[in-house]
């Protein structure tokens, strides 16, 4: 028989065991590292293809900063890296931002 555990119960269990930084910090750092690596590779690819490297890097840096503070703006009550709706929401925001950058670099 499988025993399911609530997110809050699991967090309390981790707090009792003093297990590292907890799940929230690990999920945040993993997401940020993935996002910033995508920005770096995206900047290299877009800069190579369109030749507007400086403007592209500046735009991607601005997007990276705005996306890094967006969880502070929306104030999520708790973070669960298994919540697929949050992941799909931020993935769509990220892809839309990349598409906007490509559109802006091709216009100039």
From Swiss-Prot:
It is found in: Cell membrane. Keywords: Cell membrane, Membrane, Transmembrane, Transmembrane helix. It is a multi-pass membrane protein. GO terms for cellular component: plasma membrane. The chain crosses the membrane at residues 26-46, 54-74, 84-104. This is Uncharacterized protein MJ1308. It comes from Methanocaldococcus jannaschii (strain ATCC 43067 / DSM 2661 / JAL-1 / JCM 10045 / NBRC 100440) (Methanococcus jannaschii).
